[in-house]
C-alpha cells in the first residue's frame, strides 16, 4: 500500500504542493481525481488583433534588457500580466488577482489569476521556475475550484502554468474527475499569438 502524501491534522495551502516531490498522478489520486498527459485540442480564437500582439511583443523587447526577471513577482509583472491585460480588454470576462479559496484542510490559498466568463474559467499560476512542480500546484488549484464551484457549469475547468518564458495548459473534466495536462508547451514571446489565441478562445467559447 503506497504511503499517504498528506499528514493527518496538517493544513495544506496551494504553495505547499509546489514543494511536494511526488508525481502529479499520485497527488491528484489522493484528492480523488485521475490524471493523464496527452495532446490537447484547446479552443482558439481567430479574432486576434495583430497590432495588439505586436505592441505586446515590442514592449517586451524594449523593456526586458533593462530589468531583472529572476523573481516570481517580476515574471508576473512584466511577462504574464501584460498578456492577461490584453486578453481582458478584448472579451467579456472578469479577472481576479490573488483570488482566495478555502475548501478544506488540503485545499486553500491564493490563486494568482482567476478568469471567469459566462461559460468558462481559467486558473493561472505563475512560478519563477520548475514547470513540473509548478504544475502540481496548478493541479491543486484547479481541483479546489472544482470543489468550490457549487454548480456543474461549466463542465470543464481550464488551467495554465507559466514560468514567464514558457506556458503549459491543462483541463479538468469535472464529470469524470480527470485532470489532463497538455503535452505541448508554448514559449513567450515566440508563441505569444498562440497563447493569446488560446486564452481568448477559452473565455469566448
Locate the predicted segments by residue.
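Charged, often low-complexity linker/regulatory segments
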Residues: 1-78
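An alpha-helical interface "stripe"
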Residues: 69-101
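Active-site metal-binding core of divalent-cation-utilizing nuclease and nuclease-like domains
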Residues: 93-116
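Short amphipathic alpha-helical segments and their helix-coil junctions
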Residues: 53-66, 117-126, 200-204
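Nucleic-acid nuclease catalytic cores
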Residues: 128-135, 143-180
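Conserved catalytic cores of phosphodiester-cleaving nucleases, focusing on short active-site segments
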Residues: 79, 112-128, 140-141
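Buried hydrophobic packing segments
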Residues: 80-84, 138-145
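Mixed-charge intrinsically disordered linker/loop segments at interdomain junctions
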Residues: 2-10, 168-202
